[in-house]
Amino acid sequence: MALPQPLKPINVPQTVQQAFELQRRGKLPQAEKLYADVLSVRPDYFEALHMLAVIKLQSGDPVAALRLMIGALKARPKSPEVLFNYSLVLDALGQYDEALATLDVVLSIKRRFVEAHNNRGAILEKLGRDEEALESIDRALAVKSNHTDALYNRASVLRKLGRYEEALKSFDRVLAVKPDHVKAHNNRGTALEQLGRREDALASYERALALDPNFVEAYNNRGNTLLKLARHEEALACYERALTIEPFHAEVLNNRGNVLAELGRHRDALATCLQAAAIKPNYVNAQWNAGLLQLRLGEFAAGLKQYEWRWKREERAGTQRHYPQPLWLGEVPVAGKTILLHREQGFGDTIQFARYAPLLAKQGARVILEVQPPLKSLLATIGAGIEVIGSGEDVPSFDLHCPLMSLPLAFHTELATIPAEIPYLAAAPERIEHWSGQLPQRRALRVGLVWSGNAVHKDDHNRSIALARLKPLFDVDGIEFISLQKDVRDADAQIMADDPRITDIGRQFGDFDDTAAAVALMDLVIAVDTSVAHLAGALGKPVWVLLPFCPDWRWLTDRADNPWYPTARLFRQPGIGDWEGVVGQVRQALAARLSQNG
């Protein structure tokens, strides 16, 4: 459509100069009108086409900018400046490969074009070609060492590559050139966070917020760091401040849900995560967190479906099994079929969900159960008709397959229908005999202890206890404490060496057959949320599970029993991090048990 003619004849060069001055001063609507006036009488006038294209791009209309920039290129096809701006339009349209090719042309004409090298690096980063991006940005800095955007982009790529010390130095270089660079302060904080320097990270976020009190990302990042510092109420305040600025920010809503869950406000947390997922349906963390909350609240019908989002999580990337045979989620009968059940997460998960294997065998399926090698011998006791193999062994032919942790979904499990017939595992008699000979002669109630799990588990700080915290239990007379702890941290080993009231056999264990035999010899097992708690429950042994304030979903909320393990008794932190309160409850319960036995 033709542009409207101006009301009176215009001096084209003079009008273009006026428009350029307005554009330079940031008065884009007035400049845009003058360029349009020029193009209404001179549709091919280069300066008007080029500058109006730039304004359209700055105004968020890259489609209009593209049409105008193509017109400008027809007039000056070899102009590095026009080609560079054309690459910006292509970048804005998401046409990254075309933008990259255009920048290569620019640099073949003008080799020391700093912005072209820098933008080429930024586009390579978007394409996931991070090392090449660094090379391009470094070429920009070789031309101009204090180029702020290039320094910032370099820091951002280094951070993305996990090279946090180098990223921190680059952010510091940005701030040496431009102390009020808000994004550099914010992202410097994220690099510090990754380096474990959380108080320094908070200072960086606070500097960013002092410069821009409405910077949502800085509030969000500050909240995340405060949450890791267990400053929950302050973290919540950060997220809520961010949401007053952007009420529908999905990431902030999800993080608000996380902190509400840790504060024990599970219903509020669920509503918040569902809101985040509604705003951004492909937001994996929001969908996943909503599922965990539904499961923790006992809403299995919805939660088990949401639990399938685990496969899309970044930390699970590449772990989902894909076979030519169909995935079975309960849709077809299994009678006469061979089904492979494959492990996917930790030892405790395998022990817990292997309980479904006998149910499939009862339905007429031939069951192949793949487990971690240290569990193979123990899981072989799970029942007839089930072939147990270790990970890495040859897999017999099969018709269907299912990951172990999808079995509750396949069986449409509800709280009332959890298969909880125990014991469903058994310790080997010869191992029981062996470990019986390793224990002191029984003189009292024999209690097995496990106080810490895998040190590299992401939730280890929340679920493991230092042995020193359990020392008040040792003061209860009439109890023989046995350590079933296989991996013992140095500080805990020293306590055991110095305290004769606890006998250490756990460090001698080989596989789970040894652990199971030792558990079978106990009157009671006291354990944190680790594989031994699941093992004791599966063996039908009384087990007291010590739980953090916000535990894993399978322990549910607000109850002292557990439908997965009928012999379990749960001791929950009365407040965040309050292991002293848990130990006090357990001490009283031990005294009560002894008095009943007496």
What is the role of each PLM region?
Residues 1-524, 529-598:
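Alpha-helical solenoid repeat scaffolds of the TPR/TPR-like class and their adjacent stem/linker regions
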